[in-house]
Structure formats: structure tokens, C-alpha cells
Amino acid sequence: KRPESLQYSVAAPSNAKAFIKKLDPNAGFSTVEYISKDVTEISRNDWSRHELTTEVDSVAEQGFYFQFGYNNVATSYNPSGVLYDNVVIEGGLAPEPTPAPTVDFCPNNSPNEYDDYTLTWEDQFSEDSLDTSVWSYMYGDGSQYGIPGWGNSEWQLYTGDAENVYVVNGCLYIVPKYSQSEDQYYSARLRSKDGQTFQFGRIDVGFSAPAMDGVWPAIWMMPEDDRYGGWPRSGEIDLFEGKDKLIDQINTTAHYGHDFHRYYSRWTSLTPQDYTSDPINHNVISLIWDDVGFEWVYNGVSLFTVEYASLPNLEPNPFLERFHMLLNSAVGGHYPAYAPNPDQYCKLNDTAACYDSQKLIIDYVAYYQKNTN
């Protein structure tokens, strides 16, 4: 209605309309839908109710804005003296029910095919056990590798025990667990050193990440030969890093530095359909790598591109050498924002269900070479 303090109401006949605009923040808040309804009269005394109907895709249109108001089409007059009350947005469909938590579910997705790349190696974890001709376990707190706390003051001890790492149903499961009797976290860390190396091409990994305070899952690569010396001189390539319950974010990084630790990194925010913890459908992180630079791609969308020429003091360039892959889920350390909460972790030697949202799950690792013709 119009405030009673204003002299005039809107009376028939009138070109006045009530309207709703749908705005897309990803396109400069441009109007993607305009819905209006004739409002021939607006009283100074009585409220009038006007209903307008639109459809909203809760996934594709998440974050869209709505504007509502009144406009006299004939004069483009948009008076400030119109009062609104009791604005109600009603959903026509019930939200999708939250799926029941799963245990050791594997989607068994197949690696993608690309017109400009040829698949040259893959591990779909289709056997009953880990292929130890490719993958080897790393153990302990890092001391035997010269990096106590794994260089990051991490809390966990790595094992090769079936409690922490196993292959079943076509997926690899890495499970950080808490031992109540020892007040100690255990997890697993695998690497393909001396088993499978990578040098240029495209690398795809199908995965789902855990979501607990203090967890630090990673899919990454280290140099096969340390040609230019220890870390970071010979480089490090992080395809994916997550932390805590921040499943709506993904971090991708290239580390290097002949003089001191340098890195080029990008945090990317994700919409719900791309959250990193998705035990039912999984996600695909890809690294496209050549002698010019890197591109990180997530679920088919480019996240981040870097050219070597833009990296200061890179030469001699370690990213022209061979690398191997690491898969692990750390607990605590410098990276997570929160201290680990034991109540959120699966328990060691416990018969209670350990849910897939508490595990780093790898569906496959696929390596492609770019076609030359």
C-alpha cells in the first residue's frame, strides 16, 4: 500500500505493474528473467496481495538475486513511497532428501576420453588389493625420511595396515583413524615412486575427500629424481588439497624455489554439486601439463592456469622433469585451520560403521599423452 502520509494512491485506470527480476551475479547481475503483474490500484489504507510465480533451479541458479517492486510502465516511475510487507517465497517442490551415509561405496566411474589425448596408463583399483608394483607405502612420522612431522608438524602416523588403507569394490580407501587407547591418529600415505612416473600430458584422478576438523587430504606429485636438490628446489605439484570441513573449496599449487620457497597457488570456491566430499558421484581433478605450463581442471571446468614464463627465478625449471604421485590424508599440522576432533574420526579397532565421508576415496588415476597429429 501507499503510506497514509502521502496524498495520492494509485487509482484505476493505471499502467502500474508489480514485478520480480531474477539477476545472475555471474553475468554482471544482468536480468535473466522479468515477471510482472498488472496492479491497477494501490490503496493508501488497505494492504493488497499480489502473487507472481517463477521457477528456480536450486543447483544451477544458486546465488542468484531477486528484486521485487512496483513500476508505472507508462512513465517509468518507480515510487519510493510504496510499502511492502509479508513477502513470502514458497517452494513448489520439496528439497531432495539427504542420502543415507554409505560405507565403502564406489561409483566405478571410467576415465574420460578426450579427442586430443590418448590414455596411456590407468589404475582403476579393480583388483582385490593394491598394485604394489606401482604404489608403495610410506610409514611413521616422517623421521625415517628426514622430515619429522612430515615437515608440517602433522599429528598422524602413517601405516600400511588394512585399518587405514585398502582396496575394495573398485576404489582405493585411505582412512584416517583415531586410537582412543593411545590418543593417537593413524592414516596412510602412498606414492608411485619407482612405479609410475609422469612427465607432461594430462592426469585425471576421480576422488571424494573426507570432511572433518583437522583433516588434510591431498593428491599431489613430487620429483622422481630430485635433480636440483631437496624440497623445494626440485618442485612440487599439488593437484588437490583440502582441509577441515571446507568441502566447498579446493586448493591447487605449484611449489618451487632455488633461493627460497616460492609457490603459485589458487583457492577456488565450489558450488554444492562440486563439493569435494561426494562419496556417491565423486569428482575429477585434472592436471594438464606441458613444456609451457600447467592448467588445473575440476569436473571439466578450468580452475587455474600458470605459465612457467610468469614464475620468477624458476630456472633451471624443475617442472620439465619426471614426477611421481602421492595420495594421503594427513591429520593436523600447519595447514588445517582447526585442531582435529576425535569425535569426528573413525576409531581404530572399532566395529562401528566408518562412513565414506570420513575417507579419502580414489576411484581411478588416469594418465594421457597429447596426440601429436
Residue spans for each PLM region:
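Extra-cytoplasmic beta-strand recognition segments
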Residues: 1-19, 48-56, 86-88, 194, ...
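Extended, low-complexity, turn-rich repeat/linker tracts enriched in Gly/Pro/Ser/Thr and Asp/Glu
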Residues: 9-17, 26-27, 58, 74-76, ...
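Beta-strand acidic-aromatic groove motif in beta-rich domains, primarily in extracellular
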Residues: 13-25, 62-67, 213-221, 249-251
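GH16 jelly-roll
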Residues: 91, 100-373
